[in-house]
Amino acid sequence: MTYHHLSVLVHRQAEKYGDKIALKYRDYETAQWIPISWKEFSQTVRRTANAMVALGIEPQENIGIFSQNKPECLFTDFGAFANRAVTIPLYATSSPAQAQYIINDAQIRYLFVGEQFQYDAAFSVFGFCQSLQQLIIFDRAVVKDPRDMTSIYFDEFMAMDEELQHNAIVEERTAAASDDDLANILYTSGTTGEPKGVMLHHFNYREAFRIHDIRLPFMTDQDVSMNFLPLTHVFEKAWTYLCIHRGVQVCINLRPQDIQTTIKEIRPTLMCSVPRFWEKVYAGVQEKISQETGLRKAMMLDAIKVGRTHNIDYLRQGKTPPMMLHLKYKFYEKTIYALLKKTIGIENGNFFPTAGAAVPDEICEFVHSVGINMVVGYGLTESTATVSCFLNEGYEIGSVGTVMPDVEVKIGENNEILLRGKTITTGYYKKPEATAAAIDRNGWFHTGDAGYLKDSHLYLTERIKDLFKTSNGKYISPQALETKLAIDRYIDQIAVIADERKFVSALIVPVYGFVKDYAKEKGIAYSNMDELLQHPKIQALFRARIDTLQQQFAHYEQVKRFTLLTEPFSMERGELTNTLKLKRSVVAKNYKELIDKMYEE
């Protein structure tokens, strides 16, 4: 396998693949997917790189990209790399204050923005960002503020050097590009404290490509990947770079909420996702089964049982299934499994990397039982994504797979997972104290995650900082309980409360549609959502479902009381990070009255 520096990667692939499709994006006016060939991708990156020189961008300068997923994000990335510049992605959902912090911390002069929301947020803090000189707007539909005298649209930016007059400078910079150059600074939104900029160098990505080539030999240039998670997230960013390195076609999903439509239009072979995606699939299947009766219901249940035995008890362990079991499995593969996959849009599936949170055992078993190759993994921004992931055979349900080649893992004090290797960050941008606290003198990066190794498989137990201590001195892992309860089809979001409290309670955001359906079925009258959620029958429904799911936990770990919320946790109120992780301190503050009420005698 040949490894190219990111500054030339797209051009080398264009030489190899020419008119083959490299990227696709959805035109929302025509509802058509527009293809971009490798040749066009390369030409656009070259034009972007030249326009950057015309704009005045210098080597190792920090460039901001504040946008939802768009092809322009990749043009900007690779145009910057050709100039030895550094790209800093901001989450499309970032608030003006979050954008202001990153712009000032990284001293960004040029910020590329996506749509109206990002433009408005960036322009509103322009005066508070001394380094900021100009916004470059991807979407022509954005309406500029009447006071804005400096911003330009991306097509105007590209027109700054249509003749490639600065190509000699670009070529000179590219020739000087090194693996030791900084590639990205990825700001972790952080559930506590201010964001930290994780520095990822070109050598981090080169090593990530190498170890994934060893681990994922079945990924080919015939694959089609759906780009679903934000390109700001290291999981999707590193994955998309890997796809480009492997010649995989990347289909860019602009709006996360449209994934159920776009996945059916593209029918990809690959897609990075988070456990919540599969939890919704599982909940949908359970709902369908609960509505069926007689033979159809029996067949659906049998199909899952047969799949579990065939794929998990036999194939997973490298054993050959008995002939009758195999024939039964093949029947269901052509009927029930095929229908399920087609309904989701993944009947062409090769494999589906899944990470970002714990995958409940029930979900993992179900997905593999119906013949979907979900590759569960574990990684961090600081490790250029993957630390460990499933193998096709020999994976262990409940684990996060086996450690990637040449990544060193050690279990330290408090069972903390420590990492060392060429994919690990050199530290946090302009934060020497935070870097020294995270990377010890022997080069071990301290993840803050607790876990253990067993037979070469890595298991996560909890986030060390998230451990709660009850007023009775018992330690509770809220994430373990939340992961278990969140698989219930009636539960959308959950926050476990226990710190310095005498027992465990929970704030629960229900799936409102399912609750309304249940009320209709049971003849429950109500005038508003608050009244419905307080109804004794609804309270009893949730009590029973919670008690069933939490049986495996010790008595002191179980939810004793809960409150059903009438609206979801939100990023706007600061309750969720940009990666939708709970900010527990904010939740505790925002819902203090409701929480205190649960502990009244």
Question: Residue locations for each model-derived region?
Answer:
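Structural core segment of the AMP-binding/adenylate-forming
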Residues: 9-10, 82-160, 541, 547
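Conserved pre-ATP/AMP-binding loop-to-beta segment of ANL
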Residues: 18-21, 137, 162-187, 194, ...
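Conserved AMP-binding/adenylate-forming core of the ANL superfamily
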Residues: 23-71, 75-78, 95-100, 153-159, ...
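ANL superfamily adenylate-forming
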Residues: 27-30, 117-178, 285-339
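Conserved AMP-binding A3 loop
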Residues: 35-39, 183-209
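Conserved structural elements of the adenylate-forming
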Residues: 42-47, 179, 198-218, 338
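Conserved AMP-binding/adenylation subdomain of ANL enzymes
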Residues: 206-224, 231-337, 348
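Conserved ATP-binding/catalytic segment of the ANL
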Residues: 403-470, 498
